[in-house]
Regions:
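Bacterial Sec-dependent N-terminal signal peptides
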Residues: 1-23, 39
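Interaction-mediating elements
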Residues: 21-145
């Protein structure tokens, strides 16, 4: 009986994982309102090339690729989690003021190519190949080159 329970559990786990990893192309209008507002506020001059919904086990993520190669990722609530500008720079309005001030003081001639926002930290990628990590109080906690 224990083996049967393990087999059934394994089957459901496998089905759950398989079903959870099916990306679905979507229109911009299907993004959460918060994500739509973010795109209009910071990237209105660029067209959306592709948008997709990435359902995970307990939540959904969203990914948007703009025609200039910029890739933006959103959490299920529409909050941005990552902005990666391949051929340009991240709009400074996205960068928290404390990080912007730090960059102006310590790296005045660089541009931000990408920024990731996780629950406890921000990671900022600069055009001088440095990656700076800040904690949630915006203190620098790591530099990678």
């Amino acid at each position: 009986m224990k083996k049967l329970g393990l087999i059934i559990s394994a089957v459901f786990l496998t089905l759950g994982v398989a079903c959870a990893d099916v990306d679905r192309p979507i229109s911009v209008e299907e993004l959460p309102q918060k994500a739509q507002k973010f795109l209009k506020a910071h990237f209105s001059e660029r067209d959306v090339s592709f948008a997709k919904e990435d359902p995970e086990f307990m939540y959904k993520d969203y990914e948007v690729v703009l025609t200039d190669g910029t890739k933006i990722e959103f959490a299920s609530d529409g909050e941005w989690t990552s902005v990666d500008c391949r051929y340009g720079s991240v709009p400074m309005a996205i960068v928290p003021k404390q990080i912007e001030d730090y960059l102006k003081k310590n790296y005045p001639n660089v541009t931000v190519l990408g920024i990731d926002h996780e629950r406890k930290e921000y990671e900022v990628r600069l055009n001088n190949r440095l990656e700076l990590t800040f904690d949630k109080q915006f203190r620098l906690i790591d530099i990678d080159d």
